Structures are given as structure tokens and as C-alpha cells.
Amino acid sequence: MSSARALRSIHFPSSMAERDIARARLAYEECLYLQLALRLRNDGGMVEVVPYTHTAGGHLTALRRALPFSLSDEQEAAFQDILHDMCDGDHVMNRLLLGDVGTGKTAVAACVLAVAADSGTQSCVMAPTGVLARQYADKTGPLLSQAGMSWALLTGATPAAERERIHAQLQSGELDVLFGTHAVLSDNVTFKHLSLVVIDEQHRFGVGQRNALRAKGPGADLLVMTATPIPRTLALSVYGDLDTSIIRHRPVPGAGVSTRVLTESSRDLAYGAIREAHAQGQQAYVICPLVEPSDSADDLEDVPGIARDDEGRVTVSVPLHDTATELDRLRLALPGLSVERLHGRMPAGEKDRVIDAFKRGEIDVLVSTTVVEVGVDVPNATVMVIENGERFGLAALHQLRGRVGRGSVSGTCLVMTHSKGNGGVSAAQDRLRALEKTSDGFALAQMDLRLRHEGEILGYRQHGGVTLRFVDLDATRILSNGPIWTRSSSCGMLATLTPWRRVPCAMRSPRVIDISSRRSAEDENHRR
């Protein structure tokens, strides 16, 4: 069927069968053009990009010895997949490492950094907050030093003299690894030989920011890590533009987190959970979307994880909680407990002071914005209360939930919802119901994709709108029907189509690797 006939038939079909054939024809064409565009973009358009060929050596061996543990089977499998990408020299690595909090993504990343150093090149790790970047430096840095590698930390709070020293060491090649925040995107930050870019908590960065860092090392391999890929990232992995490795199990099983969605009438249950945790010597978080009572919906525009409509706008129809008012309210409601607040507008030194006090157990309840979403590790914190839960996206909610239950005691996440009326409330309630039902980050990402759509696959919007008019992504079906991806990339396109759910097959077979499933299959074969 020609394109012109398909357009006529989809509007004026003579039968349901003709309508389905027309939609299949247009879906095929849509997928074909998308795949050609992705291939052209990955090949650098008219500019040839030569991939690096990395080699593993002494730094990696020394780093493995320095680790206080051996990599789990799933971690090792993920590392081997990444190592294969880095060493084959056929293409530039573009890989997503997906794993929930505590699955050991950081240990895998440390091994990858050692491979880049073994190759005589540099690597950069970008984190969304100074807290997380410093955590990398504090935990991973000493291991790199034991492996004979040099590293530095660059954030917005780095003193000018130290910043200049780091710039000079990067340009000379003296530094092997740079940990940093958005500060690494500065034009003054130049590398002698950047061959590896690692981006943690990938959902907190925009497309332009990721591209800007990668541009500092043409041909550099890219590894992005997250617990819940945003819709655009999941769509790219589905279309074969982003190879994916999944680690489903923690090397050391945690106590777990139970999640409940509460309305305002059940607020006493939330306060009761905080009191009970305090009685047992444990701590709690209370998360608010705003910093000050004078803030408005406009102040949410730059807040990561805030839910938006299909046009990317923040819409508010219910009162929003702020940290200042909540601090006063909790001090009245919870007498005898030490309650402090934390937010991104505080000076870096003050933020560090509050976080350190919370880690030492000097603060019982920490009222905060999403600044604690990543990089804050307090095993003694067991209760998380999230105000205006309907205002946050699934990725942010899942990450916030991951701040509790990190020790030997199970955690409790209580999501307060204030939604009334219609509009976007239904989608918000769908998000919260999904959060209650599962703790699987990838399952939540699939739900996020269905609710918020894929955004601009070839552009900069990471969710909202529908780029594809005739193709409907369903990651569950795509990943469960794995054999279709093994067909030759030269065979063209294959679409698994039903009247209302259409799944494309990429021209290039993406390597979506569920390590836990592969291990189970290997175990089953061994038993046989």
C-alpha cells in the first residue's frame, strides 16, 4: 500500500481490515524514518567519530583488590557487558545501567573508571547535586587512589584557587577522573583526553546538559545510571538507541520499604509513624515541593521530578506545602523531637552541616525539598513522608522512597495526597497507585512512559506530548518478546501490530540485557 493510499484509507476505510493495514503501513514508515534519523545522529551526521578502543590492565586489577567485597554475579555481568562495549572499538558506547538503590551500580562504575585510566585516558562522573558528587568522592575516591589513579571533585562550592588547579590538571592529563556537578559543564573545564562520561541519576539532567558534557570528548563512551529511567530514556532503549543492562537484585538484600498513599484526613497516621520511629531511636524525612510560603507554582518550574502536563507546564489546583511552614507545624505537632530543614537555596556549608547532623542522629526529623532525593545515605532513617505526592513524577517518588529502609530495619513511605477535582488528578492518582503496588523501578518507568509519553526522541523534551503518531510504545511487550530483536539489522523493520497497540522492531538490534533473567536461565540449564 502506498503512503498516499494509506492516508486515504485511514480516514475513509472501506473496512476494518483496510484501516488496520493503513495504520500498519504508516506505523512502519514512522519507525523507518525514526531509525534512519537515530542512525544518522549516532554516526555524527557528516562528521566521522572514531570510537576509543579501551584496554583493561593494572588499574582495574588493583581496584578489584581494593574493593572490600567481590562483585555479585549480576554486577560482574553488567561490568563485562560495559567492558565489551568499551573494548570492541566498533562503535561508541551508549549504555544505560539500570538498578534500584542498593544494587551496586557505583561499584560497577568504579571498575569502568579504572578501565579508562588503564587506556591512558580520562573520565568524568557527573552527579546532579553537590551532596551526591561529594559522596562519590568520599566513597569511590579512596578506592581509585589505592588503584594508583588521580582524581578531583569539582562543584559550585569549590574555591577559585582549587578550581584553577583542577582545570590545569585536566588540561595536562594529570587527573584521571573528575567527579562533579553541573560545574563540569563550564567552558573552562577542558580535558586532554576524555574517553568516558558517566552520568549518575540520569533523570535529573536535561538532554542538552548530557550532550554538552559528552562534547568535551568527541567519541567518548557514555554510561548513564538510574533507578527509574525517564520516558524519553526508556523510549530510546526500546528503539535500540540505548543499550541497556539491568541489575534487579541487591548484593546484600535490604529490609525493604512499604508504601501507603494517605489523604489529609489520615495525617495523624503519618505523625504517629514518626513518633513510633523516634521511640525506637529512628529518624524520619518530610518532603515538601516548595521552600518558602511565598513561593508559587512558578517556583516549581526548575524543580526536578515535579509533575507536569503534556505541554510541560506545572499546574496547581491544591495548596502546596513548603519547608518553612512545615517546620513550624511539625515542631508543634511533635514536641520533644529535634526538627530541622534542608533545601537547595542554603549555602553549601550550611547544607553539609545539616546533613552531617542528621547522619549523626542529632536531628530526628528532617524537613526537606527534593535535594535529598539522591546522595543522602542515612541507614537509621526509616520513615519518609512526602507532602503533595501528586505533584511529583514517578522517578522522583521512587528515588525519595529509596532514602529509607537502607539499614536493617524496614522503611515506611507515606505519600500525602491533596488532589481534588478533575484534570490531571486521574493521572496523578494512577502514579500513586502504581507506587503503592510495586517497588520495581523499571516497572514504574514503564508506567511513567504510558502516563507521560516519550517526549521528543530526537529533541530535548524528556516527556510529554507524543512524538510518534501511529506507534504506541509498550515496553512490557517489547522486552518480553525478546526473540524479535535477534533478527538481522539488515532485514528492515518488523512491527508487531494489533488495532490499538503497535510495537516497532528497531533496524539495529538493541542489547537489552536483564541480568537476573539470564542468570536464572543459566541456573536452570545447570540443574538440567
Spans of features found by a protein language model:
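Upstream accessory/linker segments immediately N-terminal to the RecA-like ATPase cores of bacterial MutS
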Residues: M1-A66, Y460
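Non-catalytic, well-ordered alpha-helical scaffold segments
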Residues: A4-R8, R25-L34, T369, H398, ...
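Generic amphipathic alpha-helical segments used as scaffolds and interaction surfaces in large
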Residues: E18-A27, A66-F69, A127, V131, ...
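Conserved hydrophobic/aromatic pocket- or pore-lining residues that grip, position, or stack substrates
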Residues: C31, L63, Q75-A78, I82, ...
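Flexible hinge/switch segments at interdomain interfaces of large molecular machines
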Residues: V50-G57, R248-P251, G407, I457-Q462
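Conserved pre-motif I regulatory segment
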Residues: V50-L98
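Inter-lobe coupling/hinge segments of SF2-like helicase ATPases
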Residues: D88-R433, L494-T496, A521
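C-terminal accessory region of SF2 helicases/translocases
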Residues: T412, K420-R528
